[in-house]
UniProtKB/Swiss-Prot annotation:
It comes from Histophilus somni (strain 129Pt) (Haemophilus somnus). The gene is rhlB. This is ATP-dependent RNA helicase RhlB. ATP binds at A53, Q54, T55, G56, T57, G58, K59, T60. Residues 40-217 form the Helicase ATP-binding domain. One of its GO terms (molecular function) is ATP binding. It comes from the Bacteria. Its EC number is 3.6.4.13. It is found in: Cytoplasm. Coiled coil: none annotated. The lineage of its organism: Bacteria, Pseudomonadati, Pseudomonadota, Gammaproteobacteria, Pasteurellales. One of its GO terms (biological process) is RNA catabolic process.
Amino acid sequence: MQNSHLSQQRFSDLALHRSVQQAIKEKGFEFCTPIQALSLPITLKGQDIAGQAQTGTGKTIAFLTATFHHLLQKNNINSSEQPRALILAPTRELVVQIANDANFLVQATGLKTGLAYGGEGYDKQLKVIDQGIDILIGTTGRVIDYVKQGIIRLDYIQVVVLDEADRMFDLGFIRDIRYLLRKCPVPQQRLTMLFSATLSYKVRELAFEHMNDPQYVEIEPLQKTGHRIREELFYPSNQDKMALLMTLLEEEWPERCIIFSNTKHRCEEIWGYLSADGHRVGLLTGDVMQKKRLSLLKQFTDGTLDILVATDVAARGLHIPDVTHVFNYDLPDDCEDYVHRIGRTGRAGESGISISFACEEYAINLPAIEEYIGHSIPVSQYDAKALIEDLPTPHRIKRGAFDSRSNLQRTIKRLKKTY
């Protein structure tokens, strides 16, 4: 069982293609993380792998390195201009993040990547794909759309990557995954890599069906919540929740913070109070347009925003560095979501703080969460008289370009007027 951030395995000791090796060196990577140290010696030999690893463990670089190495080792000219590698991820944000992480390898090797995800950018994505690509990174729905239209053929695929496989199961994408894998060459004629936070029975079944005798690699922390994360729990009344949150933000003064709530409406309420109080805060929910979502994530990463209020859409798969604090304004209904939420902090060897509210509505979720993580969350008390009393009048969300539902409604109205 590995529990350190880096292993003793050096990238320079791996039999990587020289262009990939040089890119890794220039990027400043010297030692592998545990998942990289265990998976790369297998995948560089062309063997399939099913790896268990949480986000933030370096698995993206593990499969990107292997993918670029494999395509370069084949050393065949892509005259078809069709993709030779297919990387599937559950969300468009993760697709974009993987593409960003691959940029240094793209620049060093000359291999070309294309994106395929829903929400926006259809024409832009098509333009890139039409020019010929080596690696397609996408969500299942948009990739299937391109395949059925004949825009993309998967006959030339040499590498397949399934990232966050368990999450794709949770979102109901398994039929889409199987459809795409059947369009690819048979498992014996390609390298397939699967990564998942858990290697559950259903994930292993998928590996058995569509992989060629995969090697199983598991990197599991000593405790599910990570030993670098300081957890804290409060029992506020529903009436005190907002005042307690704003008081703690004033006391903790987090450098970069994510506040999770279970519903879009509650997220908007939290955003309204914090925005009115002068905090640099962004709102990330399922209704936010893709362009706006990417802009928010960039502002948060760049430090233009200090706080991000989000539903679980941002809890998994996104690489957001240097998050110092995570607040569970609502305890999640799903135990795994608790782990993935607080896993936004304490990444890459850094420490982090997680503060959760077990309120009247969601305290019922606490026993199952503590059983799942294997320990009780330390409880802290608060003095209701010491909480901030004069809460500001919350700002209201301005509907418009901000949310996709409003855009759809406006489009329908225009069509009705036209016809």
